[in-house]
Amino acid sequence: DHNVEQEFVKKEDYVLDLEPTDGEIQMAHKGRLWFHVHVKGITAHASKPEKGADAIFAASKFIVQIQEIFEHFPVHEELGYSTITFGQIQGGYQPYVVPDACTIFIDCRLAPPVTDQIVVQHFNKIIKEIETQIPGIKISYDITGNRPYIEKNPGSILLKNLKEAVEAETKRSR
């Protein structure tokens, strides 16, 4: 239903996702949402950090807060938890300098009912809080990938025919 609402597919369409599943037929798939989060601060010498705004510190607050939110998202019966991974962090250039920039590369895997809009709302709320708490910090983000989840349709003719074809070919029940 989510994919139809977002006009990724029409209601009468069938979707066949061929990602590796160890030969098993899966009836649903998590969505994928990628972000580049850009934290801008103010550089200063480490001997006077109060003159700067530490972008890495602000990024760490963002990471902790969004991780806590993901831990409280509902669990999907088949797909499990929505997850967030901070795959890469870049920032700072010398240990004696308050870092004025930090970028976080984030991979979110979303299970129903968690949508990209829900995640973006949480991002925006956390960003506003951090920018208020730490003067001189500005946070922005780019969405660099967005594929919605696919929910199952147990009555699908495609699924029924696929299961029958696999069983006939492999002699194993799916």
Name every feature range the model reports, one short phrase each.
Residues D1-W34:
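Acidic/histidine-rich catalytic neighborhood of metal-dependent amide-processing enzymes
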Residues P20, M27, H36-R174:
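Metal-dependent amide/peptide-bond hydrolase catalytic core
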